[in-house]
Amino acid sequence: MKLLKKKGINILALAVLAFMIFVRLTSYGDLNLSVANADTETYIKGGAAPLFSKDMLTKSRLFTTNLFYYLADAQGCEIQTVSYPALRTETYRAIQPCFDRIVFFQNILSIIAWSLLSLAVTKRLSGGYEKLLAVSLITAFGFTPAIADWDSILGSESLTFSLFAISLALIIEVCFNFARENNKRTTFTHILAMVALVFWAFTRDANIYTLAVLFAVSIISYFVFPAVRKTKKLLVLITAIFLVTVVGLQSAMTSGRWATPMTNVFNDLILPHPARVEFMQTLGMPDPASAEYSTWFNENAPRAYARFLLAHPGYTLTSFTSELDGIFSENIQPYFYSEQTPARVALMAANDVLHPKTHLIFILDILLMAGLLFSLFRRKNINFTLWVGLEIWLFLSASATMAVGFFADSIGLTRHTMFAVEMFRLMMWVFLIVLFDQSNRKDEFQIS
């Protein structure tokens, strides 16, 4: 009877997933509809680099988007529908020859990604209601406009969201299978996880910091838990993550992609303030009007700005906290309009619930993580420990990504921090479900 009940729950969960996919496929119009933005041309130019050349890593865009637009053969394609929200020229999507296959792929990849993540979480839950809740909420999270609308935009955001969902799903599998040393499927999962992480890391420079946090959490786990040290495959994966992190950071610095946003920071936040200029001068900054300034800036600006933030913790903290409301104030893309069909109205209502526009999400995540850590000392089963480890990694990663997005540019803060905001929103739903599920578990397997 128990087996039949379990199979029944799994079948029902798959039925819910199938329904959610149907809604996603039928509620957003033609999957070939697209709109370009101010950055689209740079992605097309990035894809013009020869395959696997140095330019694939060191141009103005990153390897994944360069490779994506290279394979899409978008060079020479004419952009017909473009939106500039800053100029109030938002428009409706259109089918653009050449770019239709790009957004079609983005849509399909997104559907697969969020479906995989929902199944990965559902698989590791024990309660039937929690399984149904997970498959419903996680797919709805990825299929509502805050995420799904980006699949029609010719940029890096869609790939960032989708590859993150795939990476997270595979990391969950790796974590819960780490003891199966000789399992061939586990080896394949490790390889897939590393490939997904590499492609995801090289969609945006800020993603590299998430990998750095993953490496740090993995190293700590390696030394704390003997069971982890016994797993050679995990050590290989940790080493690979470290190497990708180093390559990513080196790529970001040598490419000069940081120069434009850092120029905005200096022009808006440093140079207009005499006291801040004086501090920078103690670090060797010459007169901004001098010929030497450009050389100093190219060699020292990121490091000097980081030292400024560390030396002024009050400014760093207050400048961030004062903008929290604004950072969490959006849950919809600004580039195109959509017809207000009944389906769209319903999706927007769900969107506002699943992607709340309040910085209280950040505070709730802190409280949720504190609650999970407190519960860990009282309930030491291996599954719960793994979930808490994932929560810590995601929280620290989202915090690092948000800090980089916030402080690395003075323009477009909402867009630059959008991915971190969505990570915080997703964490709240996933780990609330995990907490509900763990509170009903009866097993207490200890970590050895």
Could you describe each region identified by the protein language model?
Residues 250-341:
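Membrane-proximal stem/loop segments at transmembrane-domain junctions that anchor or position
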Residues 7-35, 143, 241-253:
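Transmembrane signal-anchor helices characteristic of membrane glycosylation enzymes that use polyprenol
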Residues 28-45, 56-85, 297-298:
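Extracytoplasmic catalytic/substrate-binding loops of multi-pass membrane glycan-assembly enzymes
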Residues 188-204, 240-245:
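Membrane-interface alpha helices of multi-pass inner-membrane proteins
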Residues 102-105, 139-171, 203-210, 417-419:
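Multi-pass, polyprenyl lipid-linked donor-dependent membrane glycosyltransferases
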Residues 100-128, 166, 170:
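Transmembrane-helix motifs of polytopic, lipid-linked glycan transferases
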